Structure formats: C-alpha cells, structure tokens
A protein has these predicted regions:
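N-terminal lobe/hinge region of extracytoplasmic solute-binding protein
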Residues: 45-97, 128, 235-239
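Short Gly/aromatic-enriched secondary-structure transition segments
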Residues: 56-66, 121-123, 193-198
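Extracytoplasmic
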Residues: 37-39, 69, 88-90, 99-101, ...
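Long beta-strand-rich cores associated with HINT superfamily self-processing modules
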Residues: 558-586
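N-terminal hydrophobic or amphipathic helices and topogenic motifs
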Residues: 2-43, 49, 56-61, 68, ...
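Extracytoplasmic/periplasmic ligand-capture domains
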Residues: 4-9, 20-30, 77-79, 107-137, ...
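Active-site-proximal polar cores
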Residues: 551
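Surface-exposed binding/hinge segments that line
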Residues: 124, 138-217
Length: 586
C-alpha cells in the first residue's frame, strides 16, 4: 500500500518557525525611487568564496548557493516552508505505508546544459555517485543513514568499502520512476532530497570528465577525494535556470541564463557573485547600486540601514549557530601551535584533550559583549548545538557564563599545573570577511591574557575554502565556524557537532560512545517524549564534555537594493548566494 502524495506534501515534523510573522521589512529611501542599474544582471557582493561546485561534495552555504542556481532536485521547498514541497525534476511521488519506499516519477522533456536529456538513469546515477564519492566531511552521511540504517554514515568500514552492489540496490530505476529503498523510516528524507546535495547530475557528462563510470575500480579510485579532488569540482552541468560561465576562485562566480530551461525563463540574463573581503568596499558597492545585495557584517548593520535606496529584512529567524571548535588531536604539520610543546611557546598536539583546558576557555568567553558588540544585538546565547525554533529545544539546558574565577581554577588544574606555570602560545583562526569571528577571537584573547599574561593567543584570518581544507587535515588548533540546518530536526545539529562520524566531531577527532548511542537512539525513536528525554541528556553531555563552545544563534538581517522584487526567505536556503530564479528588478 502507498499513500498518494499531493502536489504539496507536508511532512509530519514539528516546525515552529513563523517567518511571515517574524520577519520585518523596512525601506531606507531618500529622494525618491532609485534608478535601476544593470536591469538584466543580478549582482551579489559576498565575503566568502565557494568550496566546490560538485553537489555531492559541497557542504557549505556558499557552495550550496551557487549549486542551487545551476542544478535542480527532485522536489523543492515550497516558498518559506521547511515542511512543504512542490515538484521539480519529479512530477509525482509516493511513500509506502511503512515509510521505507520512496518513488519519484521523473519529468519528461528536460535537458542538461550539455544538451543531454534528463533520464531516470541520471537520477539513479546522481545518488549512487554521491555515495561512491563519499567525501569524508561531505553531506553523504545524510543518505547513508536512512538507506543503510542507523549507525551507517559512510561507504568506508573497518573491512574496506561497502560493496558496490549494496549501494546500487538502494536506488533503482523502474521505467520512468526512480525508487529509494530505505533501511528504516526516516521523517526528514524529503528535506534531504530537496537540498543541494540532492541535485541531479548528467551521468554521461560526468563520465566524460573522468568521474565514476559505474565500476568497482572507479569506485575505489574516486572514493573520498581530497580538497578540490572531485572531477567536477570546478565545472558544472545541471538542468537549472542558470549555467556556469566562470568560477575564478577568490574573485567571482558568473552564471548565464539557460535559455533552454524547461520552465519559464529567468528574469536575469546573468547572475554574478563577487567575492569582496572588505565590508567597506561592499558597502560602497551597495550604496552606489553596483551590486543588488551584499553580505553586511553585524558591525555594519546600523549604517547600512541608514543608506538610501536600501530594502532591509531584519529579525529573520535563522537556523544558524556559531561556535569555537577545539582540535583534540592536532596534526603534526600544523603551523599554528608554536613549539608544539607546553613550554610557554606553543601547545602540544593533544592540548585540548584536557577537559580543564576546554572548561577554562569556556568560562573565559564573554557572551554579553559578543552579542552586543559583534552581533549588535542580532543574536542570542544558546547552550547546545540545538537552536531555538527546532523541535525539542529547551531554554533551561545548562550553559556557561563568563566567570574568570572559574576559568582560572580550571586552567590552574589543567595539565597538572604545568599550563599555569609555563603558559602557552597558539593561534585562533576565523574566516576572511567574518568581522564577528574576529571580535570573538579578540574577546577570548583578552580574557585569557587577563587571567594569566603567559597565555598568548594569536589571531589569524584565512579564506573560507582554506579553513575547510585545514579543518579536515586537523591543522587548526581552534577556530570559529558555524552550522546552518540541512533539515529542521535536532538530529541535524547534534550529529555534526557531537557524533564521532559527524562533520565537526570527526574533523576535531572527538569521540564518545555514550554520546553516539544517545544520538542514534533519538533519531530512531518515534516517541516525542522519549526524544525529549534523550535530547535533554545529549544537551547535558555537551555541557559536561565541552567539545566546542557554543557562541550564539544568529538573527538574520538582509540588505537589497530597493528595486529587487520576489525575495522569499526560507531558513533552509542560503541567502546571499541566493536562488535568483524568482527574483527580478522593477
């Protein structure tokens, strides 16, 4: 038996985001309407470059933003909803009564940018290819878990790679339909399919460019590529409304309209994302109308709101958190740990394995100053990775507060007193263009120095793609990063932050079997009360273990020129590298 899914399907998951109520919209106009510049081009000024154009590899918002303009998924989120879906490359779909079989009818008459027609075999290939590639810190864990069962997050096992035939058995073609065979019911599965990692690629084009050719040998050769190692890392061939013209890393991404798009043509002939590190330069570009929207750091919000001709969306409820991450086993090749010894001129590789170090750092952070000065009030402290607006969030979970006395006690106890006696020197890292991250590092730097002048923190900015690759290699002793929801369920927050196979925990070399077990119990339970108890326990363990320091949940503020029309905010979608198809100027 199957239950028929209508054109718009609502997933039975609790979501408490009311965007239409919470988003406020304001204009800052001076001297009448602005004269529209470049009416056929949508121009974005962003601070962050993309990591990859490969949908199976890219797992950052900058990459996802470009991918969603070039590629398409089987279904897409409906407007601002995180739980309703409309057809995209699938025209219809069914879900079996037991929740373990998903079937999608593939749209006829669609072509890739290469000119090749879309077929059900392309869809099957796209998901099998993603699991074959399975970049260690990529998004593929979200497919392995529902398709292979809880506790299965990767193609790699202690006995080698999962047999290719097992991967192929999970996605099958049946005429014009493609069927997913899940190992377990999995409520967020449609949310996962609707995001950038669910994008459909051109099988023939991929193979022509050296990608997986369907064989075991190719599987072994292409599994877990290094940074930039995907055969389609810097090229693209989707079915979407825009085509890749050029990606110049660190400079710009340029897209052109797909005039053969199966849907209505996009309003813009081109979409250009310029990578501009400095806020002052982005501010000038936005004010002159040379760009249509720009990433505005929190420190620049007030002056941007006062600029003429600007449309502002503020108090936007995001599903985004920020944190300091500790590296539990720093790679020997790191250049950010000084001498590599606890001699006052560096730190040892396992510096943060001592819980008193982690607790001392946590008590040394000043949340009030950070939220007031760095975020200019557009944020709030949260105590665990689970953000407000997600089911099972509880505001009374235990959390750290600034307490330099407690910080001193823990740092005196760390490393049997040797840390306090000798001091240390290390480097904190934040992303280029992230002014709030810089301020967070400075707060910690100053407070630790106040506790003991022998505690020396250096601060260094890095480009976003470099941070991602260095994070994977374990070379960053401590760094600022964040997480935005892949889908609106607490599992999507606790897994990356705390499970030993999660993207952050794995990069940090953090592992706790008790935590892993609780996380797996929570996602497998269908009982609301049981899940609440389990997430309460997970939040308490996060507090006790301090695998990272949760800094804040962000309230979004977005800035456009007042001639931009059609913007609909969805907390699951990236914003500044936004879906330009629905936008226009007028």
């Amino acid at each position: 038996m199957t239950k028929r899914v209508a054109t718009i399907i609502t997933v039975s998951i609790i979501v408490v985001i009311c965007i239409s109520v919470l988003v406020s919209r304001s204009f800052s106009c001076n001297g009448g309407p602005s004269e529209i510049k470049n009416p056929d081009i949508f121009v974005i000024a962003d601070a962050f470059d993309i990591a990859s154009l490969d949908p199976a590899y890219g797992y950052d918002t900058a990459s996802a933003g470009q991918i969603q303009n070039i590629y398409e998924t089987l279904v897409e989120f409906h407007g601002n909803s995180t739980s309703e879906f409309i057809p995209s490359l699938a025209t219809d779909w069914t879900i079996s009564e037991d929740g373990k079989t998903y079937r999608f009818k593939i749209r006829d008459g669609v072509s890739f940018h290469s000119g090749n027609p879309l077929t059900p075999e392309d869809v099957e290939y796209s998901f099998e290819r993603g699991m074959v590639q399975d970049y260690v810190l990529g998004p593929q864990w979200m497919f392995f878990e529902p398709l292979f069962g809880l506790g299965n997050y990767t193609s790699r096992t202690d006995n080698g790679l999962i047999p290719l035939e097992e991967i192929k058995s999970k996605v099958e073609v049946d005429g014009q339909w493609v069927q997913f065979n899940l190992a377990t019911p999995y409520e967020p599965f449609l949310q996962i399919l609707a995001s950038s990692w669910g994008s459909i690629v051109d099988m023939d084009w991929c193979i022509q460019n050296g990608d997986w050719n369907g064989t075991e040998e190719s599987y072994e050769a292409l599994n877990n590529p290094g940074p930039g190692g995907s055969p389609i890392h810097s090229i693209a061939d989707g079915t979407g409304p825009f085509m890749l013209e050029l990606w110049e890393p660190g400079i710009a991404v340029r897209l052109v309209r797909n005039d053969d798009y199966w849907g209505a043509p996009a309003s813009f002939e081109r979409v250009v994302t310029q990578i501009v590190d400095e806020w002052g330069t982005r501010k000038l570009m936005l004010g002159l109308g040379d760009v249509d929207c720009a990433f505005v750091p929190n420190a620049g919000i007030q002056e941007a709101k006062e600029m003429p001709g600007i449309l502002v969306y503020e108090n936007v409820p995001t599903l985004l958190n920020q944190a300091f991450f500790f590296q539990f086993d720093i790679d020997l090749t790191s250049t950010l740990i000084g001498s590599g010894q606890l001699d006052g001129n560096g730190i040892p590789m396992n510096f943060f394995s001592d819980i008193d170090v982690r607790k001392g750092f946590a008590y040394a952070f000043d949340w009030d100053t950070y939220i007031d000065d760095a975020l200019t009030g557009y944020g709030e402290q949260i105590s665990s990775p689970i953000v407000k607006g997600i089911p099972y969030y509880e505001p009374d979970w235990p959390s750290y507060e600034l307490d330099l006395v407690q910080a001193e006690e823990h740092l005196k106890a760390a490393w049997d007193g040797l840390l306090w006696e000798n001091g240390f020197e290390m480097t904190l890292v934040y992303a280029s263009g992230d002014i709030t991250g810089k301020i967070a590092c400075e707060i910690l730097q100053n407070n630790l120095f106040e506790i003991n002048p022998l505690f020396k923190i250096n601060i260094q900015l890095m480009g976003w793609p470099t941070i991602l690759s260095e994070m994977v290699l374990g070379r960053l002793p401590m760094y600022v990063n964040g997480w935005t929801a892949d889908y609106p369920d607490p599992h999507n927050f606790v897994f990356p932050y705390m499970h030993s196979k999660g993207v952050f925990a794995q990069a940090q070399r953090y592992s706790n079997e008790v935590v892993d077990d609780l996380i797996e119990q929570a996602i497998s339970s269908s009982s609301h009360s049981e899940r609440q108890i389990l997430y309460d326990q997970i939040a308490e363990l996060y507090y006790n273990e301090v695998p990272s320091i949760m800094m804040s949940q962000i309230l979004g503020v977005y800035f456009f020129r007042d001639w931009i029309q059609g913007f609909v905010y969805n907390p699951i979608r990236p914003v500044y590298e936004m879906y330009a198809y629905y936008l226009s100027k007028g």
